[in-house]
Swiss-Prot record:
The lineage of its organism: Archaea, Thermoproteota, Thermoprotei, Sulfolobales, Sulfolobaceae. This is CDP-archaeol synthase. InterPro entries: CarS (IPR032690), CarS_archaea (IPR002726). Disulfide bonds: none annotated. HAMAP family: CDP_archaeol_synth. The gene is carS.
Amino acid sequence: MSIAYDLLLSILIYLPAFIANGSGPFIKRGTPIDFGKNFVDGRRLFGDGKTFEGLIVALTFGTTVGVIISKFFTAEWTLISFLESLFAMIGDMIGAFIKRRLGIPRGGRVLGLDQLDFVLGASLILVLMRVNITWYQFLFICGLAFFLHQGTNYVAYLLKIKNVPW
């Protein structure tokens, strides 16, 4: 297979995670996953930006993409996409947890962490489920996520979906 084919395939493999991660900002209010609780350091666990409603939307959109992908691959992709979406959101929540520990408020910027937390979460479950991802596919997805995150967040800011352009 060609490198171009492998890179396009990696986009298809990671598409549920990208869709799940990108769907969260459309939910403006909801029940915080941390129920407003603080960690031992006195700061919120995740913050108001991580809600059950946002998680449900992310899982729904990511899994729906997986159902479509399963028509081209195998039926297993419905389950894989659900778990990939879930782990992408877990990665995103871990990123929020780290930011809160560093004293960075909701909407605060941490270059690298903001763009790659969901990719790392999705990659973990893909590896555990034995989905064949090469290192260059992984690095390509990390680069793509980094630049797409910058662009899509700026557009979301212009459309008043997000409060900050990052």
